[in-house]
């Protein structure tokens, strides 16, 4: 006899499932990098007519942090390395583009080619961060999907380099830190994701701070500002489609796999594009002549390796902490990049620009905490609804064994 079993009854049989803490206020936002655990949702499954087997399938994949979260030794190591490689890549990009007169498209091509070659080596040689497993089958639209995501990834890199070439590092990083605004818009348009009142209110200081930085920035440039905003839009689109590829039910790609395939697709599209636009002025090109001597080639190769290491450590960190914690860490990285650029490059900023930078940073932090609060509230509501008694469903075991001899 086959029985239909509700989801809450199955959760008690799963080892390691965690109940939400009782007595916690729904408005409590917790610590900045606090531990977050999420329940795995199980679907009911009925056996066949001649079977008494109950099949449990996972219908929703969630990311669960370790008990220490970002404060674990391995996560702290990945966080430190990610910050270090990001800062090195950012400042080396600015040096090559501004002081040496490099082209954003050329530097982006070097970065994509470098991460493709290194990613190919990683798929053949096991390393400490990733053990590649051979894939038996690929989705039918694999090539078109990778070409599309690869195009968005390459456009994100090139547009980011164009913004670095035309505006100060501090201003470019401030504009990039406004990405949550575009995340909300893209999630609503593509995924139909709902955002609550607290999330929408948290965007006000982000937009206000960005307006102050834009109005008072000494090195403001329309091309650089437009490129930075376009980077956010392309990055949000890339993240949405990458999320679908990373969380698919039948064809699920690992993060290093997706990084390699999209980089290879970007390089494949880059070659004909460079040939076709050979005589067309490159976006962001200055009047300086760019000579390729031994030192410049060494700098370009170093930049490509640093770009790949930045991506690898970011993926490794994402595997240890939740996406919300990763987003908060990314916000902290943007804030540190802004002020380190002021120290390293001596960028002049006005008092209003400093206030705008602080407003953007605080607003993005509030946005991430509001998103976390919204997710916890929805999970609490779902758990309360799931625990409600339902007399119409027959229990898995009889409540009184004496009634069923």
Curated annotation (Swiss-Prot):
Residues 1-28, 380-405 are annotated as: Disordered. The lineage of its organism: Eukaryota, Metazoa, Chordata, Craniata, Vertebrata. It is a multi-pass membrane protein. It comes from Homo sapiens (Human). One of its GO terms (biological process) is blastocyst hatching. InterPro entries: Sugar_P_trans_dom, TPT_transporter. Belongs to the TPT transporter family. SLC35E subfamily. The chain crosses the membrane at residues 81-101, 106-126, 142-162, 167-187, 195-215, 219-241, 264-284, 296-316, 326-346, 347-367. GO terms for molecular function: antiporter activity. The keyword Transmembrane applies. Its main location: membrane. Putative transporter. PANTHER family: SOLUTE CARRIER FAMILY 35 (PTHR11132). It is found in: Membrane. Keywords: Membrane, Transmembrane, Transmembrane helix. GO terms for cellular component: Golgi apparatus; membrane. This is Solute carrier family 35 member E2B. The gene is SLC35E2B.
């Amino acid at each position: 006899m086959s029985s239909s079993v509700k989801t809450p009854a199955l959760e008690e049989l799963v080892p390691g499932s965690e109940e939400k803490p009782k007595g916690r206020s729904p408005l409590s936002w917790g610590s900045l990098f606090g531990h977050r655990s999420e329940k795995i949702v199980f679907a009911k499954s009925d056996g066949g007519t001649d079977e008494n087997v109950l099949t449990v399938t996972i219908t929703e994949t969630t990311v669960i942090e370790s008990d220490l979260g970002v404060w674990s030794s391995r996560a702290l190591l990945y966080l430190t390395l990610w910050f270090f490689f990001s800062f090195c890549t950012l400042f080396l990009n600015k040096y090559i583009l501004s002081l040496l007169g490099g082209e954003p498209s050329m530097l982006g091509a070097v970065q994509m080619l470098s991460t493709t070659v290194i990613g190919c080596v990683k798929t053949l040689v096991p390393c400490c961060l990733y053990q590649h497993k051979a894939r038996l089958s690929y989705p039918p639209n694999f090539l078109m999907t990778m070409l599309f995501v690869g195009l968005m990834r390459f456009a994100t890199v090139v547009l980011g380099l164009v913004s670095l070439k035309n505006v100060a590092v501090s201003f470019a990083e401030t504009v990039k830190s406004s990405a949550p605004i575009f995340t909300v818009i893209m999630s609503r348009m593509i995924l139909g994701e709902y955002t609550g009142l607290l999330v929408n209110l948290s965007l006000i200081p982000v937009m206000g701070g960005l307006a102050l930085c834009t109005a008072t920035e000494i090195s403001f440039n329309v091309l650089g500002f437009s490129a930075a905003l376009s980077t956010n839009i392309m990055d949000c689109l890339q993240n949405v489609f990458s999320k679908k590829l990373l969380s698919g039910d039948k064809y699920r790609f690992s993060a290093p796999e997706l990084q390699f395939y999209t980089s290879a697709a970007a390089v494949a599209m880059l070659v004909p594009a460079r040939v076709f636009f050979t005589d067309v002025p490159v976006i962001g090109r200055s009047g300086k002549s760019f000579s390729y001597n031994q030192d410049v080639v060494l700098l370009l190769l170093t930049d490509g390796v640093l770009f790949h290491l930045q991506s690898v450590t970011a993926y490794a960190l994402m595997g240890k902490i939740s996406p919300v914690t990763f987003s908060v860490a990314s916000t902290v990285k943007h804030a540190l990049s802004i002020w380190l650029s002021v120290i390293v490059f001596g960028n002049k900023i006005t008092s209003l620009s400093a206030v705008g930078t602080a407003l953007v940073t605080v607003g993005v932090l509030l946005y991430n905490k509001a998103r976390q609060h919204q997710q916890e509230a929805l999970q609490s509501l779902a758990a309360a609804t799931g625990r409600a008694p339902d007399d119409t469903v027959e229990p898995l075991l009889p409540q009184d064994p004496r009634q069923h001899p």
